[in-house]
From Swiss-Prot:
Residues 189-192 are annotated as: Aspartate. PROSITE patterns: AA_TRNA_LIGASE_II (PS50862). This is Aspartate--tRNA(Asp/Asn) ligase. Binds 3 Mg(2+) cations per subunit. The strongest magnesium site (Mg1) is bound to the beta- and gamma-phosphates of ATP and four water molecules complete its coordination sphere. It comes from Haloferax volcanii. ATP binds at residues 211-213, 219-221, 356, 404-407. It catalyses: tRNA(Asx) + L-aspartate + ATP = L-aspartyl-tRNA(Asx) + AMP + diphosphate. GO terms for biological process: aspartyl-tRNA aminoacylation.
Amino acid sequence: MRNRTYTADAEPGDTVTVAGWVHEVRDLGGIAFLILRDTSGKIQVKFEKDEMDDDLVETGLGVHRESVISVTGEVDEEPRAPTGVEVTPESLDVIAEAEAQLPLDPSGKVDAELSTRLDNRTLDLRKDEVKAIFEIRAEVQRAVRDKFRDLRATEINTPKIVATGTEGGTELFPITYFGQEAFMNQSPQLFKQLMVGSGLERVFEVGPIFRAEEHNTPRHLNEATSIDFESAFIDHTEAMDVCEAVVTAAYEAVEENCQDELEALGLEEEFERRPRVPAAHLRGGHRAHQRTGELDEQLVWGDDLPTEGEKALGEDVGEHYFITDWPSEIKPFYIKDHDDDETLSTGFDMMHPNMELVSGGQREHRFDHLVAGFEQQGLDPDAFEYYTKMFKYGMPPHAGFGLGGERLIMTMLGLENIREAVLFPRDRQRLSP
């Protein structure tokens, strides 16, 4: 529609054509109102029955909610209208009529279960508060990309179909690839490292990852967005500095540019009090264990921290924090050990009080040590020859991390289920839409 005006741009005295969805119709007798909604907001359309063509009034008042219409008319100032202006229609065209009975109420007046919402995601996204989540998600991705570019990182796109898993194990989706066995990539980790060795030195990626894990919880997905960073000539402490800077940039961008969306979610005041920059570094996974209260008796050095332990630590610390110096035996083969203590790795996790957000560390850049790491974890180095051979050609020291995109949005906005942060989530039960 060449001459269409967004509702937010309609000014008193203008003659405009606005188009969008019928949000609400109210018939008050001699006068009636239709609320039209587009991506920029809403506008009131006024029908004065005694002064308007009967067919125009009948069309406007008879159209079903969520039908797509266009309205041409003059914009008048009206302080009592939801946005302070209203349109007196000269014409109204029904572009696409919606059914009278909808599977859920986009106005939000009638609650729906999450499963119903996800089954009808297109309708669900017409709610202001749901749309706001994805406007914020888009702003977060813009902000992290800008921050990485400020740090002189180059954006890359790595393969999502691979011959071997990044970390081995069973969390892989196998596919048939022209008669060969292949998998959906569970992480861009190995390719990030190859790009560091290529001379690009500092790279990042915002892209999908696939994990065939059995967890089916409010914070797990089988397809997720990973925000990845890798850089030459830095160690794990400098990678943590970058991690802090990126998460902080995301929060600051949302606070600065998404006030309308935060208001739609009821977070305009609460958001400012949410934790943002890591305030505590728990040096040594064993010292993290010591702060888990009654659970400490159940934890054994070398074990990963269970969900209950994460929650106990979150309650104790109260804001974002790092756990560092994890036991080497529970970290992947590419994580470098400390030079002065091979039982401790340079791996780190960045935690929100409610869950893990980031996993990272310094990488093993020495070929012999890398191959030994494969063997210690029962992996065949020959299966990763495309990766390991680069370490014979001059690989610089490097470090990096992967940040869960949906988990960042979930914790930032206080969402109860990670699926609310995904347009069309994929989990163990959901493959459609």
